[in-house]
């Protein structure tokens, strides 16, 4: 893995995808802000407030107070236009971010965990459409987007990897 001069290389969550948007680690409009659990929750709250003020919420979406990804996914399954729009926006930015990585790195495969892993059916079609629109055809045709098989243990494996590196004398 490439670590960079300060050890921060590969922190793609900090890439700014938009001037505005949810915060991820204090950076407005970042990949993390649009695609992480907390980022999606904040984005959903903002979107809900805007639509509530505009009076543009569908009747079935009035009164939503739980903006967690888990609840929003459940609402999508129940036909909520608002919850669907939250996932569509997140998927759009996930697709844009992945398209940048595909164009820069030209990988054979990108493995995504966490929210994508749990909600793949709500993201996949939109993410793939954005990637096809944004990337070189040759790159898209050779890059697979896979969901991680590490489930919620991904953080444990990351911590273990850091501990092993420190123990082995790394930075």
What are these regions (language model features)?
Residues 1-7:
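Hydrophobic alpha-helical segments and helix pairs
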Residues 7-24:
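A short, polar/charged loop-to-alpha-helix boundary motif
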Residues 19-171:
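ATP-binding/phosphotransfer module of carbohydrate and carboxylate kinases, centering on a glycine-rich
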